[in-house]
Curated annotation (Swiss-Prot):
A Gene Ontology term for the protein's cellular component: Golgi apparatus
Name listed for the protein in its UniProt record: Lysosomal enzyme trafficking factor
InterPro entries, A to Z: LYSET
Known partners and oligomeric status: Interacts with GNPTAB; this interaction is important for proper localization of GNPTAB in Golgi stacks. Interacts with MBTPS1.
UniProt keyword list: Golgi apparatus, Membrane, Transmembrane, Transmembrane helix
Compartments (UniProt record): Golgi apparatus membrane
Lineage, highest ranks first: Eukaryota, Metazoa, Chordata, Craniata, Vertebrata
Main location: Golgi
Organism: Sus scrofa
Function: Required for mannose-6-phosphate-dependent trafficking of lysosomal enzymes. LYSET bridges GlcNAc-1-phosphate transferase (GNPTAB), to the membrane-bound transcription factor site-1 protease (MBTPS1), thus allowing proteolytic activation of the GNPTAB. GNPTAB is involved in the regulation of M6P-dependent Golgi-to-lysosome trafficking of lysosomal enzymes. LYSET is thus an essential factor for maturation and delivery of lysosomal hydrolases.
Record's bilayer topology term: Multi-pass membrane protein
Residue spans crossing the bilayer: 40-60, 98-118
Homology family: Belongs to the LYSET family.
One Pfam family named in its UniProt record: TMEM251
UniProt record, GO biological process: lysosome organization; regulation of vesicle-mediated transport
């Protein structure tokens, strides 16, 4: 039976054992210590960040198109609406008149919420999953406040008995 390698030094912990055919370093041990939810959380975070990096380039292409369409909209703005315009054309012209930072905020909030949810799945305690999501966070804070008010009301009803 071969003796397992000693990873007490940092330089040894980053090397692969020769001849065993599998990784048995500290990263492998940390991965084995995680439960299934944590592993899937880290995989989800990695895939989410990879998809975000791919979408980042696409967003800047949309930004250039958005700026071009917005400038065309400003330059060709008729004073009164034409008779042949449809509701989709009207909606498109109204949405193009909104600034780009507004659209960025609209898409950034759900993006960050999803990232924080995936990141919370990597935590060891399953009770803390989802606390970073705004509606759940607000519900927890309100519930704590109501519990505090209820407890303080119960304490104020108690009569003080002097002995």
């Amino acid at each position: 039976m071969p003796k397992p390698p000693d990873y007490s030094e940092l330089s040894d912990s980053l090397t692969l054992p020769v001849g065993t055919g599998r990784f048995s370093g500290p990263l492998h041990r940390a991965w084995r210590m995680m439960n299934f939810r944590q592993r899937m959380g880290w995989i989800g975070v990695g895939l989410y960040l990879l998809a975000s990096a791919a979408a980042f380039y696409y967003v800047f292409e949309i930004n250039e198109t958005y700026n071009r369409l917005a400038l065309e909209h400003i330059q060709q703005h008729p004073e009164e609406p034409l008779e042949g315009t449809t509701w989709t054309h009207s909606l498109k012209s109204r949405l193009l008149s909104l600034p780009f930072w507004f659209w960025t905020i609209i898409f950034l909030i759900p993006y960050l919420q999803m990232f924080l949810f995936l990141y919370s799945c990597t935590r060891a305690d399953p009770k803390t999953v989802g606390y970073c999501i705004i509606p759940i966070c607000l519900a927890v804070i309100c519930n704590r406040h109501q519990a505090f008010v209820k407890a303080s009301n119960q304490i104020s009803r108690l009569q003080l008995i002097d002995t």
